[in-house]
């Protein structure tokens, strides 16, 4: 198959991606591994740490999210925006534990100018001064705000598509798909890397998964980072009763993402704590080359650092070098 060559394409059709996704599993993994080896050192796995810097009270109605103010049955402690010195102390701790990227998430619908945004800029500058990559997820933003983030040295902005355009309305009604794409366009116009992926296991079809990947792969260039999340059902959210996905579904999604976006960093994200060591290794063989590292991802559990250290030692993983500051 030509896909094994790992050519960069922006013209994938949904049908092509569905066919690719549904290949016999070993054949799919073989193609994905070949593409991965052509564009990446297969032994390098980036470790990213994720911190919720402002928790709960979000006005969005995302069906999967415990931080939504719409889901009043969720037992979640709401917290105001953390102080920069507290965040930077945790970033230093994450770096000392081996993390190379520090991601900060605020449960906002959109960025608003003022003291809180200024505090986020201070956090970004501080993380970069530690020699780490800095990523934030803050919701929608305007051009002047993206410019300020770029000036602060922000490496990447996370803004996920979550799912396909066709299934999106079943999951979120308070923000349109077009809103998300506009935010991504603004971010990229200021030279900030895109961290953009989605979630599987929310009731979508295989075609929905392929459609989401098609939207991502049509971007020029492809997103620099593509997080692949498996739904973590949370009591009190509309998706609380959804069954856990089969780990091999996550393997297929990772492998397909790797083939259609050969140069992107594919990040194994939420839901990893439910995978045993062998399933995680299978995802890495299939093209994942980054994981979220730390005990908690925003408000959901993650694999423990000790478990991860044992995993990386077992596979001989090498560290990823943080991106340099623009002035360097």
UniProtKB/Swiss-Prot annotation:
Residue stretches making up the Radical SAM core domain: 43-272
Enzyme class: transferase
Entry note: cofactor: Binds 1 [4Fe-4S] cluster. The cluster is coordinated with 3 cysteines and an exchangeable S-adenosyl-L-methionine.
Catalytic activity: (4R,5S)-dethiobiotin + (sulfur carrier)-SH + 2 reduced [2Fe-2S]-[ferredoxin] + 2 S-adenosyl-L-methionine = (sulfur carrier)-H + biotin + 2 5'-deoxyadenosine + 2 L-methionine + 2 oxidized [2Fe-2S]-[ferredoxin]
Assigned keywords, A-Z: 2Fe-2S, 4Fe-4S, Biotin biosynthesis, Iron, Iron-sulfur, Metal-binding, S-adenosyl-L-methionine, Transferase
Its EC number(s): 2.8.1.6
Residue positions binding [2Fe-2S] cluster: 103, 135, 195, 267
InterPro entries the UniProt entry points to: Aldolase_TIM, BATS_dom, Biotin_synth/BioAB, Biotin_synthase, Elp3/MiaA/NifB-like_rSAM, rSAM
UniProt-listed PROSITE patterns: RADICAL_SAM (PS51918)
Disulfide bonds: none
HAMAP family listed in its UniProt record: BioB (MF_01694)
Quaternary context: Homodimer.
Annotated function: Catalyzes the conversion of dethiobiotin (DTB) to biotin by the insertion of a sulfur atom into dethiobiotin via a radical-based mechanism.
The protein's name in its UniProt record: Biotin synthase
Gene source species: Allorhizobium ampelinum (strain ATCC BAA-846 / DSM 112012 / S4)
Gene: bioB
